[in-house]
């Protein structure tokens, strides 16, 4: 799993919990440093976000399912973003742009695949589904 780099603990940054930079660094660690064949590595990404109650403190951060983010922030086109700041709160998650970037990286670099955690947190609508973005990348 390559996520949960930020959260509700006191020393946490108020930032993306599952960034592309963390994703590629972990992939490099497992393949290059640990010497595991890329085609045997399945890289994980979250179908949920972390909502911070303030843009300056991790206190009170909560996990939000991606499908809940889609509903709560419907007016903000959340599928096409990776973070939304509203009413003093900020939520970071993997929307279509970041999932596409990660999926392209996996395919272009010969990794074995992607694990989406937690699948039940994804949207069931093909237009907003994260799994659908991954699927379309792998069948190109």
Where does each model-flagged region fall?
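Soluble or luminal CAZymes and related metallo-dependent hydrolases
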Residues: 18-25, 91-98, 126
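Hydrophobic, secondary-structure "cap" segments at the distal end of domains
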Residues: 49, 56-111
């Amino acid at each position: 799993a390559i996520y949960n780099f930020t959260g509700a603990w006191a020393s946490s940054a108020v930032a993306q919990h599952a960034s592309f930079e963390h994703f590629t660094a972990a992939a490099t660690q497992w393949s290059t440093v640990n010497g595991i064949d890329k085609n045997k590595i399945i890289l994980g990404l979250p179908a949920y976000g972390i909502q911070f109650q303030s843009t300056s403190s991790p206190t009170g951060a909560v996990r939000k399912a991606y499908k809940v983010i889609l509903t709560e922030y419907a007016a903000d086109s959340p599928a096409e973003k990776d973070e939304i700041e509203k009413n003093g709160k900020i939520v970071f998650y993997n929307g279509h742009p970041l999932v596409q970037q990660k999926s392209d990286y996996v395919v272009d670099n010969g990794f074995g695949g992607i694990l989406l955690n937690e699948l039940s947190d994804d949207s069931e609508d093909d237009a907003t589904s994260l799994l659908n973005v991954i699927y379309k990348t792998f069948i190109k």
